[in-house]
Curated annotation (Swiss-Prot):
Pathway per the UniProt entry: Purine metabolism; IMP biosynthesis via de novo pathway; 5-amino-1-(5-phospho-D-ribosyl)imidazole from N(2)-formyl-N(1)-(5-phospho-D-ribosyl)glycinamide: step 1/2
Main location: cytoplasm
Entry-linked CDD domains: GATase1_FGAR_AT (cd01740), PurL_repeat1 (cd02203), PurL_repeat2 (cd02204)
Protein name stated in the entry: Phosphoribosylformylglycinamidine synthase
Residue positions binding ATP: G307, A308, A309, T310, G311, S312, G313, G314, E315, I316, R317, D318, A678, S888
Length: 1297
């Protein structure tokens, strides 16, 4: 039965205003609009009054429900029929954990009420609906009762067969089109031959499974193909040339080409995690480094948010499923799209081609896609520390003549690093009888055919098949699964996982055969054992769907009980669906129909399918030199600063958590003004060392329109000039991931791809000593469609994205682009690896003037590049560089401007020594870097450059000033002069425009004003206590350790760093999951202190922290336990971020909290990840003793941190009772409500509160993520190991003595 509950208002005033503007532009006669959430409960039986009240309370979150009955025409947006939203999965979990067991499922809709000036036509209705829902993910109904269709269960469907025995090849050709299999001609022949030999017809599920497992996406046929170019047979395949890098330089690589990610040697450090007794401890061992970079281009083109989200999720699973289980650590992301054409901010180089209806626009992709990728990383608990963003769309004369080149099919790149134990690097053996398990969420009828669909050029598959290949994300589920994997690898030799793969393209139809095949086994499977949320699915849909957040594992039968216990504790769903067999044969039995939908020898599925041969011709291109006769230097610089590849990208950065783990040593934001210009990302290898890992990226795709090989060489070289800013040592420590995107089959592109791979794999990388142990290819980067009877095509340039990964010796030595004005006299030097060639082909300058040019930059001298890296490493190690920034997109002028922005300083630059042509000198994108050197170190630095054969490439540029002005001169002639603050504003315009479209425009305007303010003083810190004094030391010396419960719920992700901070303060930190309290494995009375940790409990679906709190309040046993703990005067409680929200929701059982507010959505309506300044007030909080009067930065990472009071008197009560412990302050040190100094809009900057007796504290920012100095994005140079926030944890230790 269905019960309906009204929810809170769903759209704020500014969101409704944005909608009104869109309706006006679309000429829709909407006079009024209101929207609220509506909840649908599918019940097994009628609820009692008490149960109804409980469920009603549970579904009360967000702003208070409007007191009126809405009027107007009702349009209710619901999840697409036949799918289950991730909101539903998590909300239903909460209901069950609150004892509401009659609830089969909860689902949520968004009810719009419109008033119209006149009756809408059906065409206008369609247009209206397109503005309020995503047809890929959602549907529309008009009455709440119609939502019953969401819960309808169908009878199971049987498989179908394709009659090739009588219908022959034609029958299979028809099935190929109808099922969207993307089978090649020779594969059709192969299947007809093999099934004829087996004497039976194939089932649809078998064909589908074959198509997924053998798609270009999964099998990389082009990279494994034989090649004939211009009639000449080539010696090696593309993949062999990539593998050549490993053959030439195998140093430090532990696993390559055979697993979900590659592994290289890491550092020996203290890895921090709980032992089987629950206590967190350091474990001194090798933390080897794994690396992986994936693309998710096709799903992102179709539906950007879930496409990018599941792209990140799939890559995270690849890392976790490496070896016998590993831990993902930090992520990177990248986007290439066509021109944005922002309304009201159109640029002179943008004259967009139209696009097919089935794909999203570039602007929509860049609004929704990054939010999807960030949301997944945030909720999973992985910091996103690195990225690139390029736009390109231009009619150019390239290898195939004049045509439109661009990214209508976007690149969405997701990658990262993780750590793995030495004994788990290699996968184990799969014994006969091993249990074959699916870990993770249920099968759903979504994401069908992603592998095959992404292998087709966009436009070749039917639109409804594109529709079917969109996936759905549930990162909180993936976090639960990862916690299980963590518990397994933490057992060391007792790890129950023998073999593990993630479930990606093709679903179980690809993952399970791969698992058993890689283990040299076959498998017997039971279809109906697979967890499924939809009874009516056919065998094909159950086996082949791409439901996310799943892994397949082999576990020895004797370890099954242990594995089961670990899953139950983490509330991670799993199912034993089969056993490994001696015979390499795959059988899938269906208990419902008592038949075998699959019954195939493994060698038919994964055997020697026909090998591809590419017989292609190479092409040449004659570009025309850049015409710069009409180009004005100032205008050119302004245009380049607005080009997305150069422009400030804060809008892509602050949406992503960059502090979770407590091990981030270098994120994108640099210096006291937090400017996003870091060259590389750096993490510490553990919470107790300065060893670490670094990541950087390189890509120069437009260059491939003139020279394929040069583009590939530059991508590799740029990744090296970026990562050179940190302390690596030997260049052989750097390992690369190569992601190749190409429009295979497009004129000239195949031969060009071969040239590019050869340039990198056979030549440049071996010469530099670099290895490419991992990578990915996407070979269908072309979009075709028909418009007004005419075929249109947009083809991407050959795009190689290189991601570089390396072990770091000492993360503290990383150099940033921030120019320093506080270090005495200094000089700026350019190391010009372009050797004065100053080529302008395919540069940002060319692009903003709608040109391509002729000669692009290239690697001029490989030996100089290697020497450059070695010289920078010597200078970084000796700490002789004040600042470093490589030359890249936008050229030298952009490099210098970014350094000045980071240093909030001026420049006086002289370019006479760099060449005769001003534009070529300033805008060429040849390799190189600018360094800032103290005057007193100049001769030492010149000596090092001389020893490395670089002094002839080193040019003095001028000096740094304290003025608000950037000046560039040639001799006595002033070429350029403008205020730095004005240029800073131009550079920030892109972010401002994107934030205004996507977020609260008022917040966007406030941030834009702050960026342009020449008086902005940047961050500072002042402590009223000695940062180096360990006030807990005398108590630790007694050997006594108070016990603290490091409390987490499903979806919490900040518990490791929290435990580490308390461990350092002398506590016995115990890992306590809410399931432990439910099942009485622990009781709170056995602890002296309790900390509720940050993250996304239940994915924040019923209000941040709300579901977690209500699972306590609505459970009598837990309610009593927490009430007793809070009432005990000898205990301490801390709630941070999600824990803060949760504890605030428990105020009714915490003494002295009557004045506490609750925490609601940020004013910006966006997840905010920033460093922010806070001031500590004088209160009686035991947690903040001795800290009053201090101000310092802290990590902020939340979407719902704004305080909301029940009534106006509450704020005054807080002040009267003196419970406001900390406030956000601006750079002038005043409490503020201005964004982004106050990232959530809380009144008076309130961000931390105490209860009346000082024992309980709640705070939204994260002290545990910055308890070490090294993990602060910015900090004063005189801070040593302990950060300013370590005092809070030591205060707690002193109190509990």
């Amino acid at each position: 039965m269905l019960q309906i509950f009204r929810g809170s208002p769903a759209l704020s005033e500014f969101r409704l205003n944005q909608l009104a503007v869109r309706f006006q532009k679309a000429n829709l006669p909407v006079s009024a609009c209101y929207a609220e959430y509506i909840h649908f409960a599918d019940l097994s039986d009628r609820l009692t009054e008490e149960e109804t009240a409980k469920l009603d309370q549970l579904l009360h979150y967000g702003p208070t429900l409007a007191g009126h009955d809405p009027v107007g025409h009702c349009f209710i947006v619901i999840p697409r029929i036949g799918t289950i939203s991730s909101w539903s999965s998590k909300a239903t979990d909460i209901a069950h954990n609150c004892g509401l067991n009659k609830v089969n499922r909860l689902e949520r809709g968004l009810a719009f009420y419109f008033e119209f000036d006149r009756t809408l036509s059906s065409e206008e209705q369609q247009r209206l609906v397109s503005h309020i829902h995503d047809r890929m993910l959602e549907g529309i109904i008009h009455t709440p009762e119609e939502a019953k269709v969401l819960f309808d269960q169908q009878a199971p469907k049987p498989f179908t067969t394709v009659d090739i025995l009588s219908g022959g090849r034609q029958a299979l050709e028809n099935a190929n089109v109808e099922l969207g299999l993307a089978l090649a001609e020779d594969e059709i022949d192969y299947l007809v031959e093999n099934f004829t030999a087996l004497g039976r017809n194939p089932n649809d599920i078998e064909l589908y499974m074959f198509a997924q497992a053998n798609s270009e996406h999964c099998r990389h046929k082009i990279f494994n193909a034989d090649w004939i170019i211009d009639g000449e047979k080539q010696e090696k395949s593309l993949f062999k040339m990539i593998k050549n890098t490993f053959e030439k330089t195998p140093d430090h690589v532990l696993s390559a080409y055979k697993d979900n990610a590659a592994v290289m040697e890491g550092s020996k450090v203290g890895r921090f995690f709980p032992d089987q007794d629950g206590q967190y401890r350091y474990h001194n061992e090798d933390a080897h480094i794994l690396m992986k970079v994936e693309t998710h281009n096709h799903p992102t083109a179709i539906s950007p948010f879930p496409g990018a989200a599941t792209g990140s999720g799939g890559e995270i699973r690849d890392e976790g499923a490496t070896g016998r289980g590993a831990k993902p650590k930090a992520g990177l992301v990248g986007f290439s799209v066509s021109n944005l054409v922002i309304p009201g901010f159109e640029q002179p180089w943008e004259n967009p081609v139209s696009k097919p209806n089935r794909i999203a626009s570039a602007l929509d992709i860049m609004i929704e896609g990054p939010l999807g990728g960030a949301a997944f990383n945030n909720e999973f608990g992985r910091p996103a520390l690195l990225g690139y963003f390029r736009t390109y769309e231009e009619k150019v004369n390239s290898f195939a003549g004049e045509e439109v080149r661009g990214y209508h099919k976007p690149i969405m790149l997701a990658g990262g690093i993780g750590n793995i134990r030495a004994e788990h690097v290699q996968k184990g053996e799969i014994p006969v009888g091993a249990k074959l398990i699916v870990l993770g969420g249920p099968a759903m009828n979504i994401g069908l055919g992603g592998g095959a669909a992404s292998s087709m050029a966009s436009g070749k598959s039917k639109e409804d098949l594109d529709f079917a290949s969109v996936q759905r994300d549930n990162p909180e589920m993936e976090r639960r699964c990862q916690e299980v994997i963590d518990r397994c690898w933490q057992l060391g030799e007792d790890n129950p996982i023998l073999f593990i793969h993630d479930v990606g393209a093709g679903g179980l139809s690809n993952a399970m055969p791969e698992l058993v095949h890689d283990g040299g086994r076959g498998g017997k499977f039971e279809l109906r054992k697979i967890l499924s949320d939809e009874r009516g699915m056919s065998p094909l849909e159950i086996w082949c769907n791409e439901s996310q957040e799943r892994y397949v594992l082999a576990v020895a039968p004797e370890k099954l009980e242990l594995f089961t216990a670990l899953c139950e504790r983490e509330r991670a769903p799993f199912a034993v669906i089969g056993e490994a067999t001696e015979q390499e044969h795959l059988t899938l039995h269906d208990d419902h129909f008592d038949n075998n939908p699959i019954d195939l020898p493994m060698n038919v599925l994964l055997g020697k399918t026909p090998k591809m041969t590419r017989d292609v011709k190479s092409k040449t291109v004659e570009g025309s030199a850049l015409d710069h006769s009409q180009i004005d230097l100032k205008e050119a610089f302004h245009r380049v600063l607005r080009l997305p590849v150069v422009a400030e990208k804060t809008f892509l950065i602050t949406i992503g958590d960059r502090s979770v783990t407590g091990m981030v040593a270098r994120d994108q934001m640099v210096g006291p003004w937090q400017i996003p210009v870091a060259d590389c990302a750096v993490t510490t290898a553990s919470l107790d060392s300065y060893h670490g890992e670094a990541m950087s990226m390189g890509e120069r795709a437009p260059v491939a329109l003139l020279d394929f090989a040069a583009s590939a060489r530059l991508a590799v070289a740029e990744s090296i000039t970026n990562i050179a800013a940190t302390n690596i040592g030997d260049i052989k420590r750097i390992k690369l991931s190569a992601n190749w995107m190409s429009a295979a089959g497009h004129e000239g592109e195949d031969a060009g791809l071969y040239q590019a791979v050869k340039a990198v794999g056979e030549e440049l990388c071996p010469q530099l000593g670099l290895t490419i142990p991992v990578g990915k290819d996407s070979m269908s980067m072309k979009t075709t469609w028909h418009e007004n009877g005419e075929q249109k095509t947009v083809t991407a340039p050959l795009s190689l994205v290189i991601s570089a990964f390396a072990r770091v010796e000492d993360v503290r030595k990383t150099v940033t682009p921030q120019l320093r004005t506080d270090k005495g006299h200094s000089r700026l030097l350019l190391i010009d690896l372009g050797e004065g060639k100053n080529r302008l082909g395919a540069t940002a300058l060319a692009q903003v003037y709608k040109q391509l040019g002729d000669k692009p930059a290239d690697v001029v001298n490989v030996e100089s590049l290697k020497n450059f890296f070695n010289a920078m490493q010597a200078l970084v190690a000796e700490q002789k560089l004040l600042a470093y920034h490589d030359r890249s997109d936008g050229g030298l002028i952009a490099t210098l401007a970014e350094m000045a922005f980071a240093g909030n300083c001026g420049l006086s630059i002289h370019i006479s020594a760099l060449g005769d042509n001003d534009l070529a000198v300033l805008f060429n994108e040849e390799l190189g870097a600018v360094i800032q050197v103290r005057e007193s170190d100049l001769s030492y630095v010149r000596d090092v450059l001389s020893q490395h054969g670089l002094i002839h490439l080193t040019k003095e540029l001028g000096e740094v000033t304290t003025e608000d002005r950037i000046e560039i001169s040639r001799g006595t002639k002033l070429l350029f002069s403008q205020k730095r603050s004005e240029l800073r504003g131009i550079w920030a315009e892109l972010t401002h425009q994107m934030q205004r479209l996507r977020d609260n425009p008022e917040c966007a305007d406030q941030e834009f004003a702050a960026k342009k303010d020449p008086e902005n003083k940047g961050f500072s810190a002042h402590l009223t206590y000695d940062i180096n004094e360990d006030i807990a030391a005398p108590y630790i010396a007694t050997g006594k350790k108070p016990r603290i419960a490091i409390l987490r719920e499903q979806g919490v992700n900040s518990h490791y760093e929290m435990a580490a901070a308390f461990d350092r303060a002398g506590f016995e930190a115990i890992d306590v999951h809410m399931s432990d309290l439910h099942n009485a494995r622990y009781r709170l009375k056995d602890f002296n202190a309790l900390v509720a940790c940050g993250g996304f409990s239940y994915g924040d679906v019923l209000g941040a922290g709300g579901g977690w709190a209500k699972s306590i309040l609505f459970n009598p046993m837990l309610r009593d336990q927490f009430s007793e703990f809070f009432a005990n005067p000898n205990t301490l409680t801390l709630g941070v971020c999600n824990g803060c929200q949760m504890v605030s929701n428990l105020a009714e059982i915490i003494p002295g909290t009557d004045a506490w507010p609750r925490f609601v959505r940020n004013k910006s309506e966006r997840f905010e990840a920033r460093a922010a300044l806070v001031r500590i007030n004088e209160t009686n909080s035991l947690w903040f003793q001795g800290m009053a009067g201090s101000h310092m930065p802290i990590a902020v990472s939340h979407g719902e941190g704004r305080v909301e009071f029940k009534h106006d008197q509450q704020l005054q009560m807080l002040k009267d009772q003196n419970l406001i412990v900390a406030q956000y302050i601006d750079n002038n040190l005043n409490p503020t409500e201005i964004y982004p100094a106050n990232p959530n809009g809380s009144v008076e900057g309130i961000t931390a509160l105490s209860n009346q007796d000082g024992r309980v504290a709640i705070m939204m920012p994260h002290p545990e993520r910055v308890f070490r100095t090294v993990s602060n994005s910015w900090h004063p140079e005189d801070w040593s190991e302990d950060g300013a926030w370590m005092r809070l944890f030591r205060n707690a230790r002193v109190v509990l003595e």
